[in-house]
Amino acid sequence: MVISVATRVHSQKAEQALGLAQREIDRTRVLVERGNYTVVDLPPLAPGADQDAETALGANLTAAPTDYDHADPVDVNGDGDDDFLVQRYRVIGQEDGDGIPVAFAMGVRVYDIDVSGGGNLSTDPASLVMTSSDGGRGTQPLAVLYSTIATSDQGESLCNLNTYLRPNALPDQNEPSPTSGRLPDSCN
């Protein structure tokens, strides 16, 4: 019975954490798609982020231990007590002429509020198997999501996204447009 209760509690926390992570991704996506934002409105840059890391997704974004100081406490049930710590970050992506990111990779990690680790939290998600313990909630994130965020309705959106996804491609290696078989010349 102890295993059943512990597993149920862990699953409920993981489900809440996943929903919270998805809301953070969606909130940033809507902000960028609306187009009225500055760099300050976006998730902070990941430590050590550089131009070469811009298309890294999945495990490549989690190479360094996380910094506890950059996780924000969140109260999901409105009881006045924080339930989770949310860490949002991005890597340098494609910028417009004003230096505003218009395409970038973003990650969200959601930790239980009771995490320990003193600034050295794990980046591997906690296990969701049957357990009589905390299942890794003490040091590991309950939810980890990654996504590519990009503007989609501005004049240079297609070119910016293509440059972001294939920064080292030669002009003839770029993805074709539906009408001409190539991207517009302005993208090259």
Labelled PLM ranges:
Residues 1-12:
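C-terminal juxtamembrane segment of a hydrophobic transmembrane alpha-helix
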Residues 10-188:
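Flexible, low-complexity segments enriched in proline/glycine/serine and punctuated by aromatic residues
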